[in-house]
Amino acid sequence: MTPVTPVPPQSPQQVKGLLSRFLTAPDRHPKLRYVYDIALIAISILCIVSIILWTQGSGLALFAIAPALAIGALGVTLLVSDLAESQKSKEIADTVAAVSLPFILTGTAAGLMFSAIAVGGGAVILANPLFLMGSMTLGFALMSLHRVTYQYLSNREQWKQQKKLEQVELAAWESHLPKESKSSALEEVRYSPRLMKRGKTWRKRAIRRKNYTPIPLVDKTLQTMQPDALFSSTTTHSTDSEQILTSVSPQSSDTESSSSSSFHTPPNSDKELSDSNSSDSSSSSEYMDALETVAAGDVSGITPPSKPSSSPKTTRRVVKLSRSERNAQHHRNKDQEQRQDSSESSEEDSSSDSSQKKKPSRK
């Protein structure tokens, strides 16, 4: 024989826990609401059919149809509220169900009591089952009024107040936002894909309307430019000028190597200018042509090609004068070196003569 394990008796707390779980199941699983609503409607239909078959259409038991009808009406109302898609329709269905339930129960209780009074009045009415059923239905109506209607309306007011508080808090939070978060929110709206397409078309139209002019390298002509600016611009073209000069004559490389410091030496006197002109006239015609081409290349690199200078002869003359000044300064430096060498040699000769005079003659 198999041993029979005794089943421990369930405590009232466990029963209460099971009942609460059964009643709160639709809250945890929303799809169970439809099952509960359909179950209420089915129970009410079964009650009505069974009462009619049992009484065969006559007798006091027909009054029990009233609670079945109330339960069926409650199930239909809850099912409509659950099937409603929009939030507003759900609120309307819930309100109708919460308000109509106590009235339905109260009407059922009143019908049962009046039927008991009609059958037999006096003290016997307290023992009539219709009266007892009516009083019980009236108690259910009062409980539904407190537990369903009043609680639903109070929760509805709390929900409205909570929504208002959330809106106020959201408005206050948006008003106290820092500028960076506001700018980021505006950028998110501004750089949306729809607005980006519009921005691209607007930019293209704006670019078509504008007339862009090329920015020249130097806005001033050679006459208005300072020597420092000319020096900085001529250094960029020094390599090209050196190649051209070396292909024409061997002397041109020496002159072009000193072109980087040409514009730093201002003219000293009219005498130096005349000397430089005489030295330039003594050079050959080919050498002068090469210098002119190199000078023209340097000037074209400085001034924009769209705006040629009004007096090209003066620009060439300025370049020639600067180079002639260089040559004159080179000659002056050579003369100074020769003078220093001659003075040093004369001092050495004088010192050697004095030493020879001081030596005694030996016979």
Swiss-Prot record:
Domain of life, per lineage: Bacteria
Residue stretches of biased makeup (Low complexity): 246-268, 275-285
Keywords carried by this UniProt record: Cell membrane, Membrane, Transmembrane, Transmembrane helix
Stretches with biased composition (Basic and acidic residues): 322-342
Feature: compositional bias, Polar residues: 232-245
Membrane topology, as annotated: Multi-pass membrane protein
InterPro entries xref list: DUF5423
Residue spans crossing the bilayer: 34-54, 60-80, 91-111, 112-132
Primary localisation category: membrane
GO process terms (BP): symbiont-mediated generation of symbiont replication vacuole
GO cellular component: plasma membrane
Pfam families: DUF5423 (PF17461)
Segments of this protein annotated with the region Disordered: 232-363
Sequence similarity: Belongs to the chlamydial CPn_0443/CT_005/TC_0273 family.
Protein name in UniProt: Uncharacterized protein CT_005
Organism: Chlamydia trachomatis serovar D (strain ATCC VR-885 / DSM 19411 / UW-3/Cx)
